[in-house]
Amino acid sequence: MAKYYGGCDAGSTYTKCVILDETGKIVANITKRSRINPVLSAKDSLDEAVALVDGLNSADELDYLIGTGYGRNKVPFADENISEISCHAMGVHIAAPDVKAIIDIGGQDVKGIAIDTDGTVLNFSMNDKCAAGTGRFFESMARAFEMSLDEFSKLSLAAKNVIPITAQCAVFAESEVISLVGEGKPMEEIAAGIELSVAKRCFANDSTSDVWYPFRMRS
């Protein structure tokens, strides 16, 4: 009988689930907007992922399930709960062993993680006191541009210049962006300024400055 293993990242903004077979191949993955109740978020995502795998009827039939993320303690049927910081480190170590630093731009915080040669966490820092620089900040900027987050993420690629965003607060930054749009400034250059301001915040906050190269950005 085939064996299947699952992981559920119950994040503050999105919930992600993945199922692997016994060879390590991904056989199902789901990403859904998180609900206010993390138990329901995890259950909905797991149910959808399980439905994609022939022979599986419920998440409790998985041979092993790990819960991680903001709501990791609420993942139903989880055999183990592991912090997202440790999961990031080991996952990146397996996928790209040369990478020694990660920036995780989450829904409500930004984490910088330094990884040891065996995939364990050397050090990390986290900014969870300000919305500026988080995934929710990007979402608010996309709304200000009246486009989807996916459309917004590609907009700056067409920029020839960068218009700096000087506000350090998410609320003031949104007002500044709306003013720049009203002045007729190129939207792609404003978007580039937004993304540059977030990148600067990540580097300024992080404790992994001695291991920046090579690094991966995750969002």
Regions from the language model: what does each represent?
Residues 1-23, 100-119:
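Gly/Thr-rich phosphate-binding beta-strand-loop-beta motif of the actin/hexokinase/Hsp70
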Residues 18-20, 74-79, 112-118, 124-126, ...:
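Short acidic, glycine/serine/threonine-rich loops at helix termini
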